């Protein structure tokens, strides 16, 4: 993989996660100011997982079969950025509606979550040695999330509507940038795809394997405290008189460290013990 492609893919990953990190963990600090209730926050952080359930159908039926990956990526980010900017606009109205704002978040997430898979597809397609090159490219996504948090705290936007504008304009910029990424034809072009494959029903047979079942149950359980973290940690950090976005970004700093040492853990501990220590 040449230097030019490496830089372009690194920038892609950086902005991809900058968008998400710019608002997702600090949103409650502003939304509480405009009247969001506990139930409203519940929906704010439920629309993302719902969109994540829906998005594979879009990727399987359209993005993987009909259009070049970089073009789909560009269109989705432009639409998602527009939805986030509309949400920011609604927040500043005379009587902001939590329902309307959450619907805008849902529209944004419906566009954003497919791009997580699409950026991976695009990156892997344009690598000559994915096993070695992908981790080095993917780490720029984590750096993007970290820098988004630092920008928020540096500018004093931890509890400002400007965090949503930052995310929206970053998504629009990513949308434009995507059209200049390396051409990546749809991986499923010309292939017959059944509804069973799109729905992932063929994968259900894996649940017959005890090891896979345990892994899925563990993944399910570990996502429960993660959901509470996203919804509540920022307010706890703020009450401790710390900079919320900056302070919470250190979680991603530790992620970079563990991404570096993970190969050592694989060799010394094996998968089972590594997962046990992590959980």
Where on the chain are the PLM-derived regions?
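Symmetry-related core transmembrane helices of the 12-TM Major Facilitator Superfamily/SLC fold
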Residues: 148, 163-180
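Juxtamembrane intracellular "pre-TM" segments in multi-pass secondary transporters
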Residues: 1-3, 181-217
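Glycine-rich segments within core transmembrane alpha-helices of 12-TM secondary carriers
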Residues: 52, 131-152
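Residue-level signature of mid-helix packing/kink "hotspots" within the transmembrane helices
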Residues: 49-57, 145-146, 252-260
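Helix-loop boundary and gating motifs at the non-cytosolic
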Residues: 2-49, 211-249
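Helix-to-loop junctions at the C-terminal end of transmembrane segments
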Residues: 54-68, 156, 258-271
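Structural signature of the two symmetry-related core transmembrane helices
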Residues: 71-86, 273-279
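Hydrophobic core of transmembrane alpha-helices in multi-pass small-molecule transporters
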Residues: 14, 83, 96-118, 122, ...
């Amino acid at each position: 993989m040449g230097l030019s492609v490496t830089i372009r893919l690194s920038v892609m990953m950086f902005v991809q996660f900058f968008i998400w990190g710019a608002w997702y963990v600090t949103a409650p600090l502003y939304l509480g100011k405009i009247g969001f209730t506990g139930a409203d926050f519940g929906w704010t952080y439920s629309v993302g997982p719902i969109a994540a359930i829906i998005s594979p159908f879009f990727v399987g039926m359209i993005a993987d079969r009909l259009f070049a990956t970089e073009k789909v990526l560009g269109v989705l980010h432009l639409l998602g950025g527009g939805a986030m900017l509309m949400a920011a606009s609604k927040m500043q109205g005379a009587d902001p509606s939590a329902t309307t704002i959450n619907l805008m978040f849902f529209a944004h997430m419906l566009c954003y979550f497919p791009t997580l898979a699409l950026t991976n597809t695009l990156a892997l397609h344009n690598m000559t040695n994915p096993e070695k090159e992908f981790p080095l490219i993917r780490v720029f996504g984590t750096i993007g999330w970290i820098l988004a948090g630092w920008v928020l705290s540096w500018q004093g936007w931890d509890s400002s509507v400007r965090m949503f504008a930052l995310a929206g304009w970053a998504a629009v910029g990513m949308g434009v940038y995507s059209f200049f990424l390396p051409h990546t034809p749809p991986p499923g072009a010309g292939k017959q795809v059944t509804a069973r494959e799109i729905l992932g029903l063929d994968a259900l047979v894996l649940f017959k394997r005890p090891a896979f079942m345990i892994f899925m149950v563990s993944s399910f359980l570990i996502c429960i405290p993660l959901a509470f973290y996203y919804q509540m940690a920022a307010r706890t950090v703020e009450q401790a008189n710390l900079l919320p976005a900056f302070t919470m970004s250190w979680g991603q700093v530790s992620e970079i460290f563990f991404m570096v040492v993970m190969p050592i853990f694989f060799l010394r501990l094996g998968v089972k013990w590594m997962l046990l220590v992590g959980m």
